[in-house]
Amino acid sequence: LLLQTLLPALLHADGLSRLRLEGGTHNPLAPPFEFIDRVFLPALRRMGAEATVSLVQSGFAPVGGGVIECEIQPCARLAPIDLHERGDLASMSLRVPIRNLNAGIGNRMLAAALDQFPCEDASLEIREPGPGRGVCCLYEARFENTAELSSSFGESNVTAERVGRRAAKNLQDFIGSQTPVGRHLADQLLLPMALAGSGS
């Protein structure tokens, strides 16, 4: 969440800001990198902000070691955003990033998620060699006006199947609820919406 903390100040900088952030990019206690890239920043762009992130190296908790690079353009004023309607479902995708673990674990997680909530765009992603090991299930839904990403992380004494089903069930429940935004996006947009003023 370091990026979200720095972002409001950097939007008011005199010029382009470049950041290199190191630590945990995939941590069960916070939304993963993909959430920032695929859910949070697209919502912020609708408010007039221009920011991009790239994943140099993923860092699974508890070891971390991940690296993210960011570019943030100055923005004199954020525009209000209306998120009362999420619009029609446009696409879904399922990814299972895994590092330094047997690929069979990831494949079991993928299969269980698909059994719970089918999706045509699904794949296992073997991450580059690096510190630590880990696996997670990332299930994304994109709508006309917003997006949601459900994440579930591998943990000791929890089967891969349970992790996969949990991510799929959470997204399935979100889609069925007709809620316009997920709880993580709602939390992270509070400050930008306050800065944008009335209308958000």
Regions found by a protein language model. Give the residues of each.
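Phosphate/diphosphate-binding glycine-rich loops and adjacent basic-rich segments that engage nucleotide
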Residues: 1, 12, 32, 39, ...
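Acidic, glycine-rich active-site loops and adjacent beta-strand->loop/helix elements
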Residues: 23-27, 57-59
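Short acidic-glycine loop/turn motifs at beta-strand connectors
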Residues: 74-76, 141-146, 195-198
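Broad gene-expression machinery/nucleic-acid interaction feature
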Residues: 16, 50, 65-69, 134-138, ...
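Conserved mixed alpha/beta catalytic, RNA-binding, or beta-rich assembly cores of soluble enzyme
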Residues: 29, 46, 85-183
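Proline/glycine-anchored alpha-helix kink/cap motifs
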Residues: 1-21, 39-48, 86-93, 163-167, ...
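Short, intrinsically disordered, charge-balanced linker/junction segments flanking boundaries
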Residues: 113, 199-200
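General beta-strand structural signal in soluble alpha/beta enzymes
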Residues: 19-21, 51-55, 124
